[in-house]
């Protein structure tokens, strides 16, 4: 409508317009991270599919994708989670396609904006929640309502930000100005990752040392169940939405090719970490 010239958010918030929109930021994991997903967007046909989606929705927008995020934690619980059965029936906060996945696993999902998560858990409206990372979670005060924080999850394991502009406004800019915005987005891609990885690490230390939070790695069995739930959700939506299926197929082609190389080539960095730090 032109009320704003530009905005900044995560693609998951497009979910109400089209489930396919969530595939551009919070979709299933095909062995890739947010870095490779952004590679698909920029070089694997993703941006063309996104523009096709925006056109079909009648949205007058131009978007750039940047800022690869580490996998989001499974989140905050009232006790240590050791298997998926413990989570069944829990009222759990998440958004986008992740809501479908966690529902499939037997949780009762409540979709809340970030600022309402901590009060909702404090009041008992929800039993557990995830938001994004140790820094944001700490800023929201999650350590005051839970002492059990679970890192690693496939519910939102590769997410990025979307910077969007009103298309009429963007098209009115000179070619030079348009390219400045495009390259600024690409520059932010690196700065975001470098800066925030350190922030998240510092705040995770603070959560443990200063606030007495117990930090766990989510069990592989839980993450395996998430992948199975993703399969069900993707198949169900794909059977009803040909464009959703088209995007998933494109992602799989890119991920299979790129990750075949990366997984064969990359050494086990965890092995080197343990060698030096135990």
Model-inferred region functions:
Residues 44-45, 49-50:
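Core domains of carbohydrate- and sulfate-ester-processing enzymes
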Residues 40:
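General nucleic-acid-binding
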Residues 1-37, 52-278:
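N-terminal secretory/targeting leader peptides
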